[in-house]
Amino acid sequence: MSLEAKSVGLAVVMWSYPRGGKLDKAGETALDVCAYAAHMAALLGAHIIKVKPPTDVLWQPEAKAAYEKASIDISTLDKRIAHVMQASFNGRRIVVFSGGEAKDLEGLFTEVRGLRDGGANGSIIGRNTFQRPREQALDMLDKIVGIYQGKM
């Protein structure tokens, strides 16, 4: 499908959400799993990749050993985002991160700062916008834009 889309000048956008098999809820957002999902989307030809922000969980025992051996820092969201960006052809793909469950404003702004600092290309902010009154949502979005612009 990606070759067909590219042949007619369309960008390929892929939601790369790992699910199924033996993967549990914690595994869906584990750093090793999210980074691999982003990498696979890039290999499949995606120009734009959407993944969930990764947690500091390492789901696969083999990955945990490899991360420890390579001394990969996974302690903060920005470090984990940077790792996902590296897995996406070292930043040569656009990677946006889902907003997830509704959060309080400070929690959301803290997450957006971590995404920005890790090199994310953006956020998909759905329910965090639409589940708020219009004026509050617009103010929130203005602040998020300011964060990505480095003004906040």
Which residues make up each language-model segment?
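Thr-Gly-centered strand-to-loop micro-motif
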Residues: 98-99, 125
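Histidine/acidic-residue-rich catalytic or RNA/ligand-binding cores of hydrolases
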Residues: 106-111, 133-142
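A generic structural signal for short coil/turn motifs at secondary-structure boundaries
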Residues: 23-25, 131-134
